[in-house]
Design a protein with these regions (language model features):
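Terminal, non-catalytic protein-protein interaction segments that mediate quaternary/complex assembly
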Residues: 1-288
């Protein structure tokens, strides 16, 4: 994860002091790229702890195509939503978005249902009737040399109906002649401290899941950034993180899948980071 830390340092040293939508203020820099070879280990941040079950549950939720934050809570905590009404114990990274932007948009918001609109999972699994995930898998199987293996969440017609427009906008997949599946993701807006370690792990996991279904080996994950920023309320945490020495990357252990639908048979506990060790947690408030 050295490249990630180097980018944090670069933004601190060379970024612009800017205002932002949340009113928090940021140090921002535009147009960057980092790369990870998944054969060398799973790119989980070690200079602070990674909320791994949060990563897994969100991806499973995306792949279900859900628009309900309380469904994410069910996946994360493995309980029925009727048992998850205490948000001090059973909130998710999408709870604040549902309770703020979702409510502003007029979506249903109760103790057991918190709608977000046509967010990532809806676009992935039902973009005007198109299941992008199944199409992507079919296209990678039938035409591995193709240059149209795209997964997109940026549905312009629906942007204003989403509780949060997509930050990680699109990804492209590439099958090399040696049987490696690589992925490049473009992120228009990147919270470098809180969000990006989560995003790296999420797309590396998606890439590995797709490689598993396709009987390929995960290759490179390439992360391309538009507006890469550090919120002013996390500057001190970033400085502390940069003093820490990265630890050895873990290995991802997951079930063998014969189809993407087979994911329905598994839970967050079936995806394990073997050998994962990290420095203590570093916390900062999420700017919404």
């Amino acid at each position: 994860m050295k490249q990630y830390l180097e980018l944090l340092d670069y933004i601190l040293q060379h970024g612009e002091d800017r205002g932002d939508r949340t009113g928090t203020g940021v140090i921002s820099s535009f147009g960057h790229q980092i790369r990870f070879n998944l054969e060398e280990g799973f790119p989980a941040v070690t200079t602070k702890s990674l909320a791994w079950k949060g990563v897994v549950s969100e991806l499973l939720w995306f792949l279900e195509g859900s628009d309900d934050e309380r469904r994410l809570a069910e996946i994360r905590f493995q309980k029925d939503r009727s048992e998850l009404t205490d948000l001090s114990r059973f909130s998710t990274i999408w709870t604040d978005n549902a309770d703020n932007q979702g409510v502003e948009l007029g979506y249903e918001n109760t103790a057991t249902t918190k709608k977000l609109g046509p967010v990532y999972g809806v676009q992935w699994r039902d973009w005007s009737g198109v299941d992008q995930i199944k199409k992507l898998i079919n296209d990678l199987q039938s035409n591995p040399n193709g240059r149209r293996h795209i997964l997109s969440a940026w549905n312009v017609e629906k942007i204003d109906s989403m509780a949060l427009p997509p930050c990680h906008v699109m990804s492209q997949f590439y099958v090399s002649t040696n049987g490696r599946l690589s992925c490049q993701m473009y992120q228009r807006s990147a919270d470098m401290f809180l969000g990006v370690p989560f995003n790296i792990a999420s797309y590396a996991l998606l890439q590995t899941v797709l490689a598993n279904v396709l009987n390929l080996v995960p290759g490179e994950f390439v992360h391309t950034f538009g507006d890469a920023h550090i919120y002013k309320n996390s500057i001190e945490q970033v400085k502390e993180q940069l003093t820490r020495e990265p630890k050895k990357l873990p290995k991802l252990i997951m079930p063998n899948l014969d189809s993407i639908d087979a994911l329905n048979e598994y839970s967050v506990d079936d995806f394990i980071l073997e050998g994962y060790e990290s420095h203590p947690a570093l916390k900062a408030p999420m700017a919404i």
